Amino acid sequence: MPVSTRASAAGGQPWSSAAPAPASAPGRGGARREILTNHHHHGLKEKMRALTLFYEQHKQQLASSQGGGARGRRSIQYAVGEVGGDENGRNAEEEDDVGRKRHDAVPAAVLRENMAPPEERAPPPPPAPPPKSSHVVVFSRQADPTEKENVSHGGIATMSCPIKKAAPALPAPAARKLSLGGGMAARLKTAGEAGAGNGDAAGSRIMVFVRLRPMSRKEKDAGSRSCVKIVNKKDVYLTEFASETDYLRLKRVRGRHFCFDSSFPDTTTQAEVYSTTTSDLVEGVLQGRNGTVFCYGATGAGKTYTMLGTMESPGVMVLAIKDLFTKVRQRSHDGNHSIQLSYLEVYNETVRDLLSPGRPLLLREDKQGTVAAGLTHYRAYSTDEVMKLLQQGNQNRTTEPTRVNETSSRSHAILQVIVEYRSIDGGSIVTRVGKLSLIDLAGSERALATDQRTQRSIEGANINRSLLALSSCINALVEGKKHIPYRNSKLTQLLKDSLGGSCNTVMIANISPSNLSFGETQNTLHWADRAKEIKTKALTTANEEVLRVTDSETDQAKLVLELQKENSELRQQLARQQQKLLTVQAQTLASNASPQQSPAPSAQISTPCSTQRKVKRSILAGNCFNTPDSKRPAAENAQVRDLQRKVKAMEAEIEKMKKEHLLQLKQKDEFIRDLINRKTSNVPEAATCERRVATRASVRKAQKDAAAAGELRSPSHRFTSPVPTAKKRTFWDIGGNSPSTLAVNGRKTRSHVAAETPKGTSMLLQPGFARQRAIH
């Protein structure tokens, strides 16, 4: 842009503020007016006057509308909207451009005013008081047709007007709300108020919950601070701590804000987590719908504790199974329920059955979805049976210690519970099938946080690979793409129905409060915030199948249902009797071990695996095996005495069988010894003569005998010297063509041993020996 000075614009004659301008010729004055008219700064003075007048008008409007508060602010927003901007205003680039134009216009106006003669100058406008805080607002302006050069592009001018500074809503530090658009916050607020109790709302999108674990002792010893704060049980504030010497990160936004359906602080119990997240899914499964609960988070964030828990505080899996059997027992009067479960894991991109370990399983797709071919399904009749199967599967699951977690899960575990409800409604059989999937994902981890160049690093790479595939599927579902990459991992293939199918899905994100794990916590919250936008298929109808039957078939179906119900009750009674038998046997063993002590009550007596059984009873609050000894009837005591007598008789019989077995072993040893002695005594003395066939086996045996007899050995220690009384076979004897051999035996064999020593000496040199000279 060319630069013009006052001297050049005035024809090279500067004016003084004290002296008047000299008179000039008419031609020269016309030239000067032509220069000023064609100059690009011409008209800025008029523009500044108009802006100042407009500013004064709006200043008066603001002063009059201060009592209205929000009404005045809305009027400014409406004025902004008339220009064509949206409700959020211009973006940062447009604001910068407008600000630069405004600052460029001020010195230009000053230059235009100084170029004018003193008598033509207008008095400057009164200075406005500086506002405490300014906000850029855009207004429309009617352009004068005679001043075309004063009209900016689009007819837009800029100015700044003071606004009332709003008080902060929370005493928290400055925070930035992520991935929340204009109406997203209101929608999430409405969904959060509804909670997880609305099953229809849960079917439209994935419900996301966040759980914060307490600070561990190791983190406290390391001097870590808490960087996570939960407000109103929904909002999560994440604060980043940085040192003052970290100059590259001083200007970064330290606060981050996330909003979820519900957030659990570190003081939340397992029962509260289950009632908020999973209890409604169990009810939906009984009605014939599918439900999925899975935990996500970094290693050591508390995923396994949330899903499995401990004996004192059981997790979501145990509480869901207990609640499921309780509700089935309450509703079994109007129909028949059957419960099947399977337990599998995804370890290093291979699917394995935890209840019956063997070779890896193959994933196949059918009408029901993705299934694992060859997976074992067990039919359970009580909570106790499910607990045994769950404990067996957890023992087969891969868990290894790492630098971060001593009991780190190295695989993704999936427990699937299939509930089938069958009832008779009029002349038809109604069957409802619901599936509940409880998934414990392995922890995402960095390679630096675990052991490098070991098996742990390979496992961590496969874990991160499957979680990355899961993130890709979530991003594709959020963006509404046609192709979802489910086949990139075995985990995503198994979760296909849970993510994009007709299923109620709940995700629990576990995070750590320590600032040492800030990166992992931030990634987990971003991942959960992204998963919040996944839309699943609405569950309008349940998985229900109606089969029409005739009257005769209806009677048969009723009979089948009654038999199945009776079978279930008998199985439960059998389980109780087995538990009682184990208790009685343990009591008998304890009384035999310490007869002088008084027998303890049956509730305190444990089986050989006493610790596990006692803890298992603490998990199942509704266990029907906790009957005290004082309430048992007399008939049961008589039965106990009969069982004790039977146990004693069996023990005596076992001792007798042991003695007989020892006696048989002794007789067997004596018989073997006699056979050996008889064999050695019946060996003829002629058999002790050496064979005349030089084989490798006979040579080795002859070497040992020669050491005692004083025979000479060759330097190679492989062949013995010939005995004077018995000569070795000749070349013809080895070939089997010797006449003496044929005459005696009448047949030719390569391994024949001559009965008599041949009279002719062999001319074949023995290896390692010199030729023998004939003695005449």
Swiss-Prot record:
It comes from Oryza sativa subsp. japonica (Rice). PROSITE patterns: KINESIN_MOTOR_1, KINESIN_MOTOR_2. InterPro entries: Kinesin-like_fam, Kinesin_motor_CS, Kinesin_motor_dom, Kinesin_motor_dom_sf, P-loop_NTPase. The gene is KIN8A. One of its GO terms (molecular function) is plus-end-directed microtubule motor activity. This is Kinesin-like protein KIN-8A. One of its GO terms (biological process) is mitotic sister chromatid segregation. It comes from the Eukaryota. Residues 554-592, 634-671 form a coiled coil. Residues 205-534 form the Kinesin motor domain. Residues 1-31, 80-135, 590-611 are annotated as: Disordered. ATP binds at residues 297-304. Keywords: ATP-binding, Coiled coil, Microtubule, Motor protein, Nucleotide-binding.
